[in-house]
């Protein structure tokens, strides 16, 4: 959980910026957006498989390009 301690001499805007940065770093908003709507288990599986195939294709392309002839 993200939290920020504020000093008496610190401006509120600066503390809000620090809080926003910390929330983005922890991925809280991204996780919330993922869980905002229900997603069927089959859809989740299809999305993960698609990402895995994309990752493998990228890896094979890189290995093919890096070969020296």
Curated annotation (Swiss-Prot):
One example of the protein's molecular function in GO is: structural constituent of ribosome
Biological process (GO) annotations held by this record are: translation
Q: Does the keyword Ribosomal protein apply?
A: yes
| Record-linked Pfam families | Ribosomal_S21
What domain of life is recorded for the organism? Bacteria
The record ties this protein, via InterPro entries, to: Ribosomal_bS21 (IPR001911), Ribosomal_bS21_CS (IPR018278), Ribosomal_bS21_sf (IPR038380)
> One GO term of the cellular component aspect?
ribosome
Keywords of this entry: Ribonucleoprotein, Ribosomal protein
Question: Member of which family?
Answer: Belongs to the bacterial ribosomal protein bS21 family.
HAMAP family found in the cross-reference section: Ribosomal_bS21
What this protein is called in its record is: Small ribosomal subunit protein bS21
Q: Which gene encodes it?
A: rpsU
């Amino acid at each position: 959980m993200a939290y920020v301690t504020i000093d008496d001499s610190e401006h509120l805007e600066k503390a809000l910026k620090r809080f926003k940065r910390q929330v983005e770093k922890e991925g809280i908003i991204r996780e919330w957006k993922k869980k905002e709507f229900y997603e069927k288990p089959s859809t989740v599986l299809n999305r993960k498989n698609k990402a895995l195939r994309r990752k493998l294709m990228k890896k094979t392309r890189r290995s093919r390009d890096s070969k020296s002839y």
